[in-house]
Amino acid sequence: DIIPQNLNAGGVHMDNEKNLKDEFKKADIESINLWHHREIRTATINDLEAVAAVEAECFPAAEAATKEEFAERIKFYGDHFWLMFDADKLISFVDGFVTDQPDLTDEMYENASMHNEKGAWQMIFGVNTLPAYRQHGYAGELIRKAIFDARAQRRKGLVLTCKDKLIHYYASFGFIDEGISESVHGNVVWHQMRLTF
């Protein structure tokens, strides 16, 4: 939407410079700046502090993974973290390991060594976006990236659990509600959702 429409096939603007400036003035300059500086990449141990801080801001203590748990997760499956940065600031991330087990269990949250790089299912343990950066589609962009990567890696699909109020949100990405999960993580009722390729 922010790219002027009146370009010829070679990408050369057909009108004068003033028209180009006018079109960009109509665009959301803040969105342009965020788009321009956003980076998505996997995690290394150097991201530990930032990841733990975002998690703590996004989830109640009973549900949030600890810094120590994230250290283990990054050690075993850093390539299955999708981190989004605004310049140097971590603003959103998605993570989860890969397994042949079809259902997400509470043990998986606590035992990163269960990761099996050749597994059939990409689990999603957390979808986190800092409150100040919500409602911009950043989490959705990371979910789509996780789906894209899982498909490229020839997984069977992805599995996550969510609260009742988010079923509709995840359904918009193709996840199907399978009902109440056996998970009691954080003493909360969770729905298991699955996207099968």
What residue spans do the PLM features occupy?
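Conserved acyl-donor/pantetheine-binding loop and adjacent beta-alpha core of acyl/acetyltransferases
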Residues: 92-128, 134, 183-189
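Short, Lys/Arg-enriched N-terminal segments with co-localized hydrophobic residues
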Residues: 1-13
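Conserved GNAT acetyl-CoA-binding A-motif
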Residues: 143, 150-162
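Conserved catalytic-core motifs of GNAT/GCN5-like acyltransferases
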Residues: 23-27, 98-101, 161, 171, ...
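Conserved acetyl-CoA-binding loop-helix of GNAT-fold acetyltransferases
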Residues: 129, 135-148
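A short beta-loop-alpha structural element at the N-terminal edge
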Residues: 37-51
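Active-site rim helix/loop that mediates acceptor-substrate recognition in acyltransferases
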Residues: 61-87, 93-114
